[in-house]
Swiss-Prot record:
Binds to the 23S rRNA. This is Large ribosomal subunit protein uL15. The gene is rpl15. Belongs to the universal ribosomal protein uL15 family. InterPro entries: Rbsml_uL15_N, Ribosomal_uL15, Ribosomal_uL15/eL18, Ribosomal_uL15/eL18_sf, Ribosomal_uL15_CS. The keyword Manganese does not apply. It comes from Methanocaldococcus jannaschii (strain ATCC 43067 / DSM 2661 / JAL-1 / JCM 10045 / NBRC 100440). It comes from the Archaea.
Length: 143
C-alpha cells in the first residue's frame, strides 16, 4: 500500500524521529568508522570472516619487459585479406605469398577456414594454423 503522507510527518515532534535511543544515529563514530576503517584494528574479525582475501597478494607479477606480446591474426582473416586484394600478393607456383609482418602482424592463429593455398611467412605460427594451411597445399615459413 502506498502511503499518502510521509512517515516523518507522523514522527515529527518526537525527540529522535524513530531512531531509537538518542545515542544511536550519531554518525560514523557510531559504526566504528566509515567504510573499511579499522580493518586491521577493531574490525579485524569481520574482515577474517567475511572478506578473507581482502588483504595480501597472490600469484606472480612479471616485469613488462619480460612479457612477449605479439600482434596476432587468424588464418580466416588472412584468407579474407588475400581474397579481397589478390593483386597485392605475389604468386609462387599458384600459391599466394603472404608476408604477415608487412601486414603489421607477427603471429598467425588457427581460427577460421582456409580454402586457398598460401605460403605464409610469420615470426610464429600456431599448430592449428599450420595444419590448416598445409591441409590445402600451402606452406609455412617461420622467420
Amino acid at each position: 500500500m502506498i502511503r499518502k503522507k510521509k512517515k516523518v510527518k507522523k514522527i515529527r515532534g518526537s525527540r529522535t524521529c524513530g531512531g531509537g535511543s538518542h545515542k544511536k544515529r550519531r554518525g560514523a563514530g557510531n559504526k566504528g568508522g566509515r567504510g573499511m576503517a579499522g580493518g586491521h584494528k577493531h574490525k579485524w574479525t569481520w574482515i577474517i570472516k567475511y572478506c578473507p582475501d581482502y588483504f595480501g597478494k597472490y600469484g606472480f607479477k612479471r616485469h613488462p619487459s619480460l612479457v612477449k606480446r605479439l600482434e596476432t591474426i587468424n588464418v580466416g582473416e588472412l584468407e579474407e585479406i588475400v581474397l579481397k586484394n589478390p593483386d597485392k600478393f605475389e604468386k609462387e607456383d599458384d600459391k599466394f605469398v603472404v608476408d604477415v609482418i608487412e601486414l603489421g602482424y607477427e603471429k598467425v592463429l588457427g581460427k577460421g577456414k582456409v580454402t586457398i593455398p598460401m605460403i605464409v611467412k610469420a615470426v610464429e605460427v600456431s599448430e592449428k594454423a599450420r595444419e590448416k594451411i598445409e591441409a590445402v597445399g600451402g606452406e609455412v615459413v617461420e622467420l
